[in-house]
């Protein structure tokens, strides 16, 4: 599409050079340049030609009325439509080439403003009497790279599906304030969206930092709890039977010697983390003492039965019944 725009600008340069020549002093001569420029098959933009002093001189009150209308005609080719030409009186008649050019330019404008582009709407806007005329015009626009699209005559209603339009229409000066207002409103909406996104990002980061802080505190608490359990287990084993634990050192077990804590859930159960006020029946089938000692119980498996609800609360010690093989 950009190549089409460049080609259109290049095609206009020869007509601009003619308006800048020393011979471009006659209104009739300028009107002839406008006619040739709007009839050329490769010219689609005309704003640069409109800005030339010789062309703007046609607006002078001293210019004959028959030539003043050529300036209006050039403005319609720059940013107007076929309907604008039909509704403006006293304009020069169009040649076949000019009529096809103006219809093509009008198709570009309609493709950017009307959705969907039905056959009926296009034929009315372009003053075409048959669908075949519209299809021929659209085909010319597609092969000239003015639009990208396809014809859909079998749909109900028949439509022209346009996906892209070449930037070949000039901007009308009076429409600039509206464009600026539209862009300003769009900028404000973008700023609001960006502000909302930044606020959400800050919230996510704060939540993430808070979660990390909680996880760190939880990890520290667990580590301290495990250290406390290790210390308590070692202290309990220091008062063990000197006759046991041969090879562990004379006079009993040293601190933490031979103490192998089981998994965390078992340790937490033993320490009363899951509630110690209920009846407890614990059975060690592996023959190890419940106190954490690694010495094997020579008198059988250790089963301690703490009978009676509230036995822990009363503080009364119940004797353990050791069940196993008699020696």
Curated annotation (Swiss-Prot):
Disulfide bonds, paired cysteine numbers: none
Tissue: Present in uninduced vegetative hyphae, induced conidiating cultures and in both conidiospores and ascospores.
SMART domains registered for this protein in UniProt: PINT
Recorded GO CC terms: COP9 signalosome; cytoplasm
Protein's cellular compartments: Cytoplasm; Nucleus
Keyword match Zinc-finger: no
Region (Disordered): 233-260, 276-327
Compositional bias segments (type: Gly residues): 236-255
UniProt KW Cell inner membrane keyword: no
Family designation: Belongs to the CSN7/EIF3M family. CSN7 subfamily.
Complexes and interactors: Component of the COP9 signalosome (CSN) complex.
Stated name of the protein: COP9 signalosome complex subunit 7
The species this protein was found in: Emericella nidulans (strain FGSC A4 / ATCC 38163 / CBS 112.46 / NRRL 194 / M139)
